[in-house]
Amino acid sequence: MNKFTNLLIKRTASSLKGGDFRELFRKNYIPITQFEKVLLSVTSCVEGLKNPTDSNSVACITELTSNRALRKLQILMNSTPDGRRIIKNRPLIDSSKYSIKDLMAFPDDSLGRRYGEFLTTYNLEIDRAPVRYVNSEDLAYVLTRFRQVSLNDYK
């Protein structure tokens, strides 16, 4: 990423470890103006085209352009009892609660086991980058949850 993008992104050392989601949202949220949003979107798109393996650019673009999709996901989650429970309780799947070894101990057909297998297969970590530019705490949680559990359904 270029110097301008790094200034706007203001990387944080925090991850989704510990604390409740409200605390994490307040700690990581970076308010930006509409002009900054457009500029950061364009810059991230250019950086993403120059380096397609840069997940930071993809994450940034997602946060800046997915408001409508996040609202639809929130509506979809609220349409089922399990989804409403998840939205209400805001559980996080992160290294403060689980290790990959813990996930692999879950039953074969469980989300935990499949997630552990996915992380192991692709040599990934449990923690995901915090959401920084979504200005709604509820929608930021939906995106956080999406990042945590929607990685190709752990094929």
Swiss-Prot record:
Q: Which UniProt keywords apply?
A: Lyase, Membrane, Mitochondrion, Mitochondrion inner membrane, Transit peptide, Ubiquinone biosynthesis
What broad class of enzyme is this?
lyase
InterPro entries the UniProt entry points to: Coq4
Stated EC number for the protein is 4.1.1.130
Enzymatic reactions: a 4-hydroxy-3-methoxy-5-(all-trans-polyprenyl)benzoate + H(+) = a 2-methoxy-6-(all-trans-polyprenyl)phenol + CO2
Subcellular location field: Mitochondrion inner membrane
Q: In which pathway does it act?
A: Cofactor biosynthesis; ubiquinone biosynthesis
Q: How does it assemble?
A: Component of a multi-subunit COQ enzyme complex.
- The protein in question is named Ubiquinone biosynthesis protein COQ4 homolog, mitochondrial
- Give a Gene Ontology cellular component term annotated to this protein: mitochondrial inner membrane
Cofactor requirements of the protein: Zn(2+)
How does this chain sit within the bilayer? Peripheral membrane protein
| Disulfide bonds listed in the record | none
Annotated family: Belongs to the COQ4 family.
One of its GO biological process terms is:
ubiquinone biosynthetic process
Q: Name one Pfam family in it.
A: Coq4
Record's function text: Lyase that catalyzes the C1-decarboxylation of 4-hydroxy-3-methoxy-5-(all-trans-polyprenyl)benzoic acid into 2-methoxy-6-(all-trans-polyprenyl)phenol during ubiquinone biosynthesis.
